[in-house]
Every structure is written in C-alpha cells, then in structure tokens.
Regions:
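Conserved glycine-rich cofactor-binding loop
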Residues: 15-17
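Catalytic loop of short-chain dehydrogenase/reductase
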Residues: 93, 131, 137-178
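Substrate-binding pocket helix/loop in short-chain dehydrogenase/reductase
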Residues: 98-100, 107-110
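The beta1-alpha1 cofactor-binding region of Rossmann-like NAD(H)/NADP(H)-dependent oxidoreductases
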Residues: 41, 61-72, 105
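Active-site loop of short-chain dehydrogenase/reductase
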Residues: 6-7, 55-56, 83-84, 130-143, ...
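C-terminal helical subdomain
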Residues: 178, 182, 186-187, 194, ...
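Conserved glycine-rich Rossmann-like NAD(P)H-binding loop of the short-chain dehydrogenase/reductase
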Residues: 29-45
Length: 248
C-alpha cells in the first residue's frame, strides 16, 4: 500500500533512458512512481528495480499517441490516489532527420502527436489532480534543438516539436502562477548516453557523453515541494536555471 505521505509521480517514457533514470531517482526519494511506456516487458523490469529499492510503482502500458487513453488516465489516477504531485513529460521520439521540404507528412504528424499533443492532453487530463496536490510540480524534458541561436539543419520536425513543447510548458506556468501551487519547469538534458542520441549521432563515442542518471540527479529536485520557481529552463550542460529572453 502506498504511504499517504508519498509523492505520486507520473513519468512518461519511463521504461528506458532518461525516463527510466528519472523514475528510479524519484523512487529513491520515496515517490510512488506511475510509470507510463509502450512496452510491458520493459515496464516490468523497471518495476523490479523500483521494488529492489524498497519503492512502489504503478505500471501504465500506453502509447502516447493514444489520446483517448491519456484522457482516461486522469480519471483512473483520481479514483486511486485522489491527486497527482508530479508530472514528468519525458516521452518523445526523434523522427527522421531530413530537410523540411522532404519530410513525410505521416512522420511529421507522428512526431507532433507524441512530442507536442500528448503533453497537452496530459495537462488537460491531469491538471485537476495537480491542483489537488499541496505542491503540484510539472517537468517537461526539452532539447537544445528547440532554442539554438542558429537552428541546426535537418532536425526540423524534432526541433519544431520541442519548441512547441516549450511554449506549452511556459503557457501552463503562466496560467497556474496565480491560481494554484503548481510549478512548471523545463529541463534540457543536452547530449546524453541514450538510444535516441545514438540514432541521431551514430558515429559518436557514447563513452564521451554524460549519463541519464547524472541528469536525473539534477532534474528530480525540480519536482520537489521545495522548488518554487516556475516557467524557467534548467540547462544541464551549463548547470544553470535560465530565463527565456525576448528577441533583441
């Protein structure tokens, strides 16, 4: 049984990479982790790891593109827990690295569905539960591809999706600032030793990269009740919390 004092934390894309590291770090902090990912087997492995830490998890095998399932998730979590303390919007896909003029509409729509629309549907479904928490926290994982001073060619669908995600998170931060205790943050992990990074940069030596676990150690405090800032971006490569600046 989940302790009444345990933080209830939902992590999307929780079965591997950054999501897995965040889920395990939250479990170490005593949170009951609601782990959402597509693959049941990988979720079962995560559950075993969380139990080995003495923690508890609820497994949600779900495709982020299944918007009806995301809509139902809020009701299911409310029935079981009555609130949600932490939402970590981590799940995402890279999509093809291709010139914008050559991007296939199906690929474009899939990237936008998972990286953008799914996070809006989660906010829509889970906002009442975050408001029911005494210290609701939302953390969305972005990318440096979204806000480079000079955009990188061929990353169009992914970069556009992450820029849209940043706008969603900042809008949600503005809308909750004076109406709730919710705090909303973005985090840019930078280059990490993940499967997505290997797909994007196949010639790169992964041993030169930092790990998802190192990032999680820095990112999880953004989900704590003690964290009181909102609408800002934590940049892991520079280890700084940044404001968004208006164009010059």
């Amino acid at each position: 049984m989940t302790s009444p004092s345990a933080r209830i934390a939902l992590v999307t894309g929780a079965s591997r990479g950054i999501g897995r590291a965040l889920a395990l770090s939250l479990a170490r902090q005593g949170a009951h982790v609601v782990a959402l990912a597509r693959t049941q087997g990988a979720l079962d492995e995560l559950d075993d790891e969380i139990r080995a830490l003495g923690g508890q998890a609820t497994l949600v095998p779900c495709d982020l593109a299944d918007f009806d399932a995301l809509d139902r998730l809020g009701a299911a979590l409310f029935e079981r827990f009555g609130r949600l303390d932490v939402l970590v919007g981590n799940g995402g896909i890279l999509g093809p690295l291709t010139p914008l003029a050559h991007a296939d509409p199906k690929d474009w729509n899939k990237v936008m569905a998972i990286n953008v629309t799914a996070n809006w549907r989660l906010i829509r479904s889970l906002d009442p539960l975050l408001r029911a928490s005494s210290a609701g926290r939302a953390l969305f994982i972005t990318s440096g591809a979204a806000h480079r001073a000079r955009m990188k060619p061929y990353w169009g669908p992914y970069a556009v999706s992450k820029a849209a995600l940043e706008a969603i998170a900042r809008t949600y931060a503005a809308e909750t600032e004076n109406t709730s205790s919710i705090k909303v943050m973005l985090a840019n992990p930078g280059p990490l030793r993940t499967r997505m990074r290997a797909l994007a940069m196949p010639g790169e030596d992964p041993a030169t990269l930092r790990t998802p676990e190192e990032f999680a150690e820095k990112a999880v405090p953004l989900c704590a009740p003690e964290w009181l800032e909102s609408g800002r971006l934590y940049d892991f490569p520079s280890d700084r919390v940044l404001d968004f600046a208006a164009p010059m």
